[in-house]
């Protein structure tokens, strides 16, 4: 059984390793797509790696590195979201890391759904090594080794650059005719001190740009999964995290750890509306529609002291502090023609400001005996924005009873809070000159979980969990409607709400089962499944399905490695995924025409579903191990059966001037996608 890194974690915690992200079909070396194999966790759609944890919005998921919550670590990220089409995080520089899906320890605040606690591994401090790889998603290079022959200090550096243009010329369909450009990097210097203590200097970041020019597509090109099919869009993002982590043992029973870093993120875009001649596809005009530029710079510190009081008691005390400068600007046309004059535009966002957030915590672990272990903790969250942005006491509790050497029961309780995406506070509604949501408060979630695990064999484990989550303080519109922020966060669209209040509620409950055969004797297998329900009640008082209530999800993965000659290994892996279809409602054609995007009627919203989701993936690798070098080629065949899984509706007016259902197009997720790579290690 694989234990998580955090000793305070009792329940709803999983460790994932580099080995798993390499072997699992369809994971693409991405921590988020890897986590979607866990019970209770599923991807939002094929074009992005947002994850839905126990029916919650992806907005409730955070990423942490060295105790610091980092910005969205994905290329082409939307402000406030947690996912994107392609991860900046690369499994080659990550060490074994933890993922939490509920009632997480008290050191993890400002999250109501899930937490990635990621570790950047140290470089090899004995010899210099090099890894090079080229494939569909980029050409990448990694080098690591000792900094000096006279110490155990090491370095690790990695860089990746996009190669999609070359593969698009070969006819590979990525869901868009545009060519995304991106690059990312990671670096770490690990510096142990002779008299004890360690300093690590690390950084990671990425830059991305795409121009989706629908106007230049032919009529036969079809829809674009990454853009609106009535607009030309230019979109760019970047993020950078750079920090220093210091650890030092104070004595044999205690140590301190402190991380200080700066986080920088930017998203910018401009859109032009396409007006086509209904009788001639190639006859069109472009009218400026909107442009925005969002910037944030955050300075963070995470510090803690860990003390083993005696054989039975361990105490951890610490805090996370963040100071943020931000600048949000966005203007949009005020008329359908969108003439390029100053008086035809209005600000949707126009705010320069700063904020401070502080999260102190304490965690305690007590061993009543080898059979019974308790963890308990308290945390608090304070944000200096809004009238209800202080959560003074959030208790966390975990209890584990080891029935025998093979089986155990676990129990967890947690009270969690989370701030809203920062930009949502500063939206300026049409007809107003001031933002009207600056006093948004926190969202709260109470978790209760009961689990059972059985180590059937040394390489085979069974785990089941049942859970219930009660959510309050969800932002909903003050005017009665079906809108709730709990349905946001899984796509490329930002939120432009009316006046909001924290009066929405919701709940999630479910049953999860995992049966895992760990890699041994050259093969592994995993089955994970969940049955769940996810509901919310907005300001109109009508209980509805959340947009993420698919009701069920199941995964089966298996893989085996074969020795096919001296120093040669053939690897085969399969993955089968089934899940409930995406929620939908009845489209309002008139409102959609007014807004230029799909608008659903409040009546019957999310009552119906698209057809259920199915995907079959196969991964094949061939590795040649030589004395000083290793070669590996691989191909991941995603959606091998070309299953037509429905993504959503989009607004695509046919030009006849009549607002009706003919203006609404049905979009499908990615079809068959072959992902090839070649890798060399020496």
Tell me what each language-model feature is.
Residues 472, 525, 577-596, 613-615, ...:
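C-terminal beta-signal and adjacent terminal beta-strands/loops
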Residues 74, 215-220, 406-448, 468-494, ...:
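Surface-exposed extracellular loop regions of Gram-negative outer-membrane beta-barrel proteins
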Residues 2-104, 115, 121:
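Periplasmic N-terminal accessory/gating domains of Gram-negative outer-membrane beta-barrel systems
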Residues 468-470, 492-582:
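Gram-negative outer-membrane beta-barrel transporters
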Residues 135-161, 174-213, 234-258, 262, ...:
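Transmembrane beta-barrel wall of Gram-negative outer-membrane proteins
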Residues 289-290, 294, 298-302, 348-353, ...:
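Outer membrane beta-barrel strand-and-loop segments of large Gram-negative receptors
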Residues 198-249, 264-295:
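Flexible loop and strand-edge segments within Gram-negative outer membrane beta-barrel domains
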Residues 228-249, 353, 417-471, 488-518, ...:
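Outer-membrane beta-barrel signature, preferentially recognizing the C-terminal barrel domain
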